[in-house]
A protein has these predicted regions:
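PDZ-domain C-terminal substructure recognizer with occasional recognition of PDZ-binding tails
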Residues: 88-112
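Short aromatic-glycine motifs in intrinsically disordered, low-complexity regions
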Residues: 81-82, 110-116
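Short, hydrophobic/aromatic-rich segments at coil-to-beta transitions
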Residues: 42-44, 74-79
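Short, positionally conserved secondary-structure boundary motifs
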Residues: 1-55, 86-87, 94, 98, ...
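Structural motif
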Residues: 62-63, 77
Length: 133
């Protein structure tokens, strides 16, 4: 990741998403976005999302995914996978000998495999970043 992210101020207190609370502007600490977003820099890659198949998981077209290749993928995780040399982002389903890639949007079908298909999990999605403005 870029050294541009270095550190920024983070409020020590949380901000309620319900009823407003009194603000305390003097309590801030420094946080490194690099260390917050990336636990293993040598195995972390950023991908830009293209498409709408994962909106139910909060991943939208244009989002930036932080993907860690050093994490062993398990059932239920959102992963970047290759299928016959094509990449996709889906939720990994791995139960009772069945493996498939699940979309998180009912308008898209899950991806199942036949013997001739080559599928591998490329990495595990650890963050999805979206620009609001």
């Amino acid at each position: 990741m870029s050294a541009v992210l270095q550190t920024i101020s983070q409020a020590v207190h949380s901000v309620p998403a319900g009823f407003p609370a009194a603000a305390n502007e003097s309590s801030h600490e420094q946080v490194s976005l690099d260390s917050y977003l990336v636990s293993n820099p040598a195995s972390t890659v950023l991908f830009r999302v293209r498409g709408e198949s994962m909106t139910g998981a909060g991943i939208y077209d244009g989002d930036l995914l932080v993907v860690d290749r050093s994490i062993e993928p398990v059932h239920g995780q959102v992963v970047v996978a290759t299928i016959n040399n094509d990449m996709t982002v889906k939720r990994l389903y791995k139960r009772a000998g069945e493996v498939k890639l699940q979309a998180a949007n009912p308008q898209f079908q899950d991806i199942t495999f036949v013997e001739s298909d080559e599928m591998s999990v490329w990495g595990v999605v650890t963050f999805s970043l979206r620009r609001w403005n």
